[in-house]
Amino acid sequence: KKDLTGSIQSVTSKELSKLVTTDVTETLNGRVGGVLVNKTSNRPGSDTKIEIRGINSFNFSNEPLYVIDGVPSQTGMRHLNSADIESIDILKDASSSAIYGSRGANGVVIITTKGANKRQGFNIDYSGYVGFKTPTRIPEMIGNMGNGLEYVDYRTALWKKKYGDASLSRPDFLTDDEKRRIKHGEYYDWLRELSQNALTTSHSVSATGGTDKLSFSFGLGYLKDDGMVGDESFERITANVGLEYRFSDKFKTGINSYVSLNNTNEGANDALINAYFLPPTVSPYDKDGSYLFNCQPTSSKINPFVQIENNKREKEANYTNFSGYLEYQPIKGLSFKSQIAVQYDSDVYGEWVGTMTQAKGGLNAPEAYRKEGRNMNWVWDNIITYDKTWKNIHRLNAIGLYSVQKENHKGSEMRGDGLPYNSDWHAIE
């Protein structure tokens, strides 16, 4: 780095191993100067956005270019397991990212996964953790934590001021069920009942080995991150294989492959919002123990637990990266490398809105929405490098690059209305 004029910062595998995170992108926050990391939401598996040295455009994306094992990627780093990453290099300015042209105008994030480089022996490594998440701060609402009389006093004063003393005898002031619950001191803390402790678990196993001629690596990873509201969750399975064969000291070849399978449950719309609006004097349960749809007849907000059961938002994503290379070094300091890499990713987003939801009001027939996208990207790079140093003072480093890239993107959307009551978004496949 001392020979570079551009701004480059790196995060190594050793640094990554010390951090506990479900999204590799979050490891850059606060550790790389000039890099801002923002999550779109706190739901498990939510997207993460990176800005390098601030906002460059008000009309277009400010996302940097991601290059994973030599292949420009559209998917960011969410599908990667931090245990599989060798290094992350962030190129911040125009001089350091010039090789990528206009695509690198917002900076470049280069991710290199672990490959086969061990020449002797055999090692098996395991890393993992299990953790719990709990809400650290729940807003103090009027009448929460069993203090329902505080809400009753507030509501009484509000109605007197707005409608007069006579309004307290109106049936829409307090329902018979609310009066019964107040009489017996039965109050419901909606936010605390809807929130829950959540489990996060991650396990990674890797094996490396080799001889003088052959090196290999293999890894498996599993991550499950549950949310603190409803059935929100993120699940990821990863696998990687690397092989390198050395014909001689001058000539070698190798392959690297990476596969990631991701499933995200984004939970229900409106459930948490509804919990903020419902008073502690109403219950989510009917007398027979089943869930009520309208907990309070005078409110437009439905039972959040019913919303969770009847509104599904799910995403299924797959990612595959395969690369093969040949490298030849005819003389000391001069090397030629040819690499071809193929990346394929697909994602399917589906949403189901049942009859018993806030949007349908318990009256209209269910509807479903499905969005699907597929990306195929291949790159062929041919690189000639000459590196020579004279008397430990003068250094010459020259690089010649010829690259060919092709991208193919396909997508579709569909929506279905009036679907059977007990179906889901898979009904419109």
Q: What annotation goes with each model-predicted range?
A:
Residues 1-240, 245-254, 258, 319-322, ...:
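Short, small/polar-rich motifs associated with maturation and membrane association
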Residues 2, 118-186, 197, 227-234, ...:
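Surface-exposed loop/interface segments of Gram-negative outer-membrane beta-barrel transport/assembly proteins
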Residues 333:
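Active-site and adjacent substrate-binding regions of carbohydrate-active enzymes
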